[in-house]
Design a protein with these regions (language model features):
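Conserved N-terminal phosphate-binding loop of PLP-dependent enzymes in the Aspartate aminotransferase
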Residues: 1-198
Length: 198
């Protein structure tokens, strides 16, 4: 996928607050304008902190540091290590889970994923499938919350009980320790009529 425009939040400055960025293809970026003389056929792009010098230098420094340390590749390798370890644990305990990695974002699905049908381009029609199966949605939500709480009780912080992020700071030893903690949770998982309990 090659986006027409990409918008970044504070990650563009290594987590520094009040930072963001917009980038994209020239044909679209040239239609952006700032200041009073935006002219016809241009979209005004600006904000309170636009071109803030401190945010700009934070962003520049973050990008240079990412290049110097090869941070994205390192984080991706640690994501692969975590994902491979999770898959091995899932197999070991015969759990109906799915783990996959997208760069440095590891997904751990402990219950069926929700899906929308956007073919009609109507939110109402798209959401109808979910509404027809709302009992399953509640079971899914409950299972995810329980698994997320079990992870947290074992020192694992996830996003919504299903996503984990690796970074340059993660080492093989840190990933292995995380996998030991996941194993503590996985060996206690039980399937019930109300979903999975840990």
């Amino acid at each position: 996928v090659v986006p027409d425009l990409t918008i970044f939040g504070k990650i563009v400055a290594g987590g520094y607050p009040a930072a963001g960025g917009v980038g994209g293809k020239k044909e679209y970026a040239q239609l952006m304008a700032a200041g009073l003389a935006t002219g016809k056929h241009r979209a005004y792009v600006g904000g309170t902190l636009s071109a803030n010098p401190l945010s700009c230098i934070a962003g520049y420094t973050a990008i240079k540091e990412i290049e110097r340390t090869n941070a994205c590749e390192v984080a991706g390798r640690m994501g692969d290590r975590l994902c491979d370890g999770l898959k091995a644990l899932i197999d070991k305990y015969g759990l109906p889970f799915v783990a996959y990695n997208q760069g440095s974002i590891v997904h751990l699905e402990c219950t069926g994923a929700m899906s929308f049908d956007f073919s009609s381009m109507s939110f109402i029609k798209s959401a109808m499938g979910l509404l027809k199966h709302k009992d399953m949605m509640y079971v899914r939500k409950d299972s995810m919350e329980r698994m997320g709480a079990a992870y947290m009780a074992n020192g694992i912080v996830t996003l919504a009980g299903s996503r984990l992020y690796t970074s340059l700071a993660d080492t093989p030893e840190i990933i292995d320790e995380a996998l030991e903690r996941f194993e503590e949770v996985f060996k206690h998982v039980k399937k019930t009529d109300k979903g999975l309990l840990a």
